[in-house]
Amino acid sequence: MKRYIIILVLFSSAWGQKRIPFSIDIRPRLIEDAKILVNVEVVNHVGRPVDYLEGFLSEFSGDQFLGEKRMVLIYHYEPALQTGFSTTKSSTFELKGNSPSSFEFNISKVKFDGENRVFAWHPKSGFIRID
């Protein structure tokens, strides 16, 4: 009987964990001590293909917000991003000061293949329908 309870607890804890729908990897590269090339890679862990993916790449220097750029990683006319696959886009920023800035990417719009609904995604809130 104890074995069944232990197995039940292990299976329920494994299934009860939240899956993260997207993993985001940001890699800044310094180019000729004048520019920063920022590569943003997003991996789809959702069980559905993503037809459109848009977000904002924010630049920070310490705690100070310096600005942001809009990035569309997947357009409607491109093939959908399948589960387990990734897409990468790059953007350039000017080097301000001696040390490079830090960057953060936030997903603002997600549209799944075959749907008309548009969602926003946040790591703490999950998917929020916006259109």
How would you describe each model-predicted region?
Residues 32-34, 49, 83-85, 99:
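Solvent-exposed loop and beta-edge segments used for protein-protein assembly and interaction
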Residues 16-39, 45, 121, 126-131:
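Low-complexity, acidic Ser/Thr/Pro/Gly-rich terminal tails and inter-domain linkers that flank the onset
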Residues 88-131:
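Terminal connector regions
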Residues 42-44, 59, 93, 109-110:
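Hydrophobic beta-strand positions in extracellular immunoglobulin-like domains
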Residues 3-16:
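Sec-dependent N-terminal signal peptides
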Residues 63-98:
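Intrinsically disordered, low-complexity Pro/Gly/Ser/Thr-rich segments with frequent PxxP/GP/PP motifs
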Residues 48-66:
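Short acidic, flexible loop segments centered on an aromatic residue
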